[in-house]
A protein has these predicted regions:
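A short helix->loop->beta-strand "cap" motif at the edges of active sites that frequently abuts
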Residues: 58-64, 170-174
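Pre-active-site segment of Zn-dependent metallo-hydrolases
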Residues: 2-38, 50-54, 131-142
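Binuclear metal-ion centers of metallo-dependent hydrolases, dominated by the metallo-beta-lactamase
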Residues: 79-93, 138, 143, 162-207
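Active-site-proximal loop/helix segments of hydrolase catalytic cores
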Residues: 50, 106-169
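Structural motif
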Residues: 2, 35-36, 98, 122-124, ...
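Metallo-beta-lactamase
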Residues: 34-46, 60, 66-121, 175, 195-207
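Active-site environment of divalent metal-dependent phosphoester hydrolases
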Residues: 10-11, 43-47, 72-74, 91-94, ...
Length: 207
């Protein structure tokens, strides 16, 4: 099992009251036993101590944690019998039959990454929080099957227009919009991308 940027608390509201979570926490997700946790950058909604403690502190299992420098330093504070891997841009990791590769992202954190995951014959690209930046495309292969891209347009993330341009340039077969509905009331149906799949909160999607 792979978990990416888990945020299952209301930690951010303590810093900014406007960023209260609009969706309740599904506590069943706190009981997941991940093999790999990926944190794409060092912001509280991506490296959340209140969430990570369930996966790293309250377990005797060994978990692989992949994170760029600043996020890695935060996650590593949990200690335990875990493998904390500093996963900066152009890093790679193989866990079983799953391959991970980190790529450039453009965000307000100093060390953000996107992640490409190759599993079961498909390539999944998680952009992480990012703005549109031409340099990113140097890292992206031309055979992405599924891409996950932010659309909220605040906090140094792409808006829907830029996310559509970005998706078209990547050329992924399927595009999943993310970073909506948690701190805002965005309607993902306003994301005008023909090959999009809109997920429902806490529901499995087949991509």
């Amino acid at each position: 099992k792979i978990i990416i940027d888990p945020y299952l608390s209301n930690s951010v509201v303590k810093i900014n009251p406007k960023n209260y979570r609009r969706q309740p926490v599904d506590e069943s997700f706190l009981k997941i036993e991940p093999d790999v946790v990926v944190c794409t950058h060092n912001h509280l909604d991506h490296v959340d101590p209140e969430t990570l403690k369930f996966y790293l502190a309250d377990t005797e299992r060994s978990v692989v944690v992949l994170a760029p420098e600043a996020a890695w330093a935060e996650a590593k504070k949990f200690g335990g019998n875990h493998n904390y891997v500093q996963f900066n841009r152009h890093s790679s990791w193989t866990e079983g039959e799953v391959e991970f590769y980190s790529v450039k992202a453009q965000h307000s954190d100093i060390h953000p990454i996107g992640v490409i995951i190759k599993a079961e014959g498909k390539k999944y690209y998680i952009t992480g929080d990012t703005l549109y930046n031409d340099d990113i495309f140097e890292d992206i292969p031309n055979d992405i099957d599924v891409m996950f891209v932010p659309i909220n347009g605040v906090g140094n993330n792409m808006n829907m227009t830029d996310a559509k341009r970005f998706a078209q340039r990547v050329g992924a077969k399927t595009v999943v919009p993310v970073h909506w509905g948690l701190f805002d009331d965005l309607n993902p149906n306003d994301f005008k991308c023909e090959n999009k799949v809109i997920p429902q909160m806490y529901k499995e999607i087949n991509v």
